[in-house]
Regions:
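Solvent-exposed adhesion/ligand-recognition segments of exported proteins
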Residues: 11-15, 19, 23, 182-185
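Structural signature of tandem-repeat unit edges
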Residues: 5-10, 29-42, 49, 53-71, ...
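Short, solvent-exposed mixed-charge patches
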Residues: 1, 190-192
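Short, aromatic/basic amphipathic alpha-helical patches
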Residues: 144-153, 169-182
C-alpha cells in the first residue's frame, strides 16, 4: 500500500539522533517533521536544545526537513562529536547563542532572510570551513551591542562566510562581520 505524501517515516542517518527523536516524538513522518515549531529540551521543556551536551550524536543533516521551526537556541550546544554540515531552514528567524558551540561541524548554511543571531553561535567550532548566509540584508544580533562579533571565540580564523553576491560589501561594513574582511566571499564562489 502506498503512503500518502508526507506520511513517509523520517529517517535519521545518525543512530543516536534517531534514538533521541524516537524517544521524544515517536514515529516522525515528513509531515509531522515539517509541523514542529520547537525542538524540546531533554526534559520536554520547549527550549530548543534537544541534543545539548550529547557526545554520541555525529550528524544532524536532517534539520533541513524541520521547516516549521521558528527559533533554535542551544540546539547542538556542546555536542563535541557532531560533524558534517547543517542547513538551517528558512523558517528559522532566530538562532540563539551557543547554538553550535563546541561542535566539529565543517559547514552551516542559514537560508532565512533577516534572521537574528546570538553571540557565541559558532563559538569553539574549530573544524568550521564555511558558513553560508542567504540573507540579502546583514543578519543582526538578537541583543544589539558592540561586543561579541559573529565569530566570537571560535579559535579558527580560516573559515569563510559566503553571502549573496550583491551583499558582500554590506557584510564587510557591518560591525559584527567587519573583522572577517576578505574571508567574506560572494556565494557564486562557493565550492564544497
Amino acid at each position: 500500500m502506498r503512503q500518502s505524501w508526507g506520511e513517509q517515516e523520517m529517517q535519521f542517518a545518525d543512530p543516536e539522533l534517531s534514538r533521541v527523536m524516537n524517544e521524544k516524538f515517536g514515529k516522525l513522518t515528513l509531515a509531522k517533521t515539517r509541523s514542529i515549531v520547537n525542538l524540546p529540551h531533554v526534559d520536554f521543556t520547549p527550549l530548543n536544545n534537544l541534543i545539548t551536551g550529547n557526545n554520541k550524536v555525529k550528524s544532524f543533516e536532517e534539520i533541513k526537513h524541520f521547516t516549521g521551526l521558528k527559533r533554535i537556541f542551544y540546539l547542538c550546544d556542546n555536542c563535541p562529536n557532531l560533524g558534517g554540515t547543517m542547513t538551517i531552514p528558512e523558517s528559522v528567524m532566530e538562532v540563539g547563542g551557543r547554538c553550535f558551540f563546541n561542535t566539529q561541524l565543517i559547514g552551516i548554511e542559514f537560508l532565512a532572510q533577516n534572521f537574528k543571531w546570538g553571540h557565541g553561535v559558532i563559538w569553539r567550532c574549530t573544524k568550521l570551513k564555511w558558513v553560508k548566509m542567504h540573507s540579502i540584508e546583514v543578519p543582526q544580533k538578537n541583543m544589539p551591542n558592540n561586543q561579541y562579533l559573529f565569530d566570537f571565540a571560535i579559535a579558527n580564523n580560516t573559515w569563510k562566510l559566503y553571502v549573496p553576491d550583491g551583499s558582500v560589501e554590506k557584510y564587510r561594513a557591518d560591525h559584527n562581520f567587519a573583522n572577517l574582511g576578505e574571508r567574506i566571499r560572494p556565494m557564486s564562489e562557493f565550492k564544497e
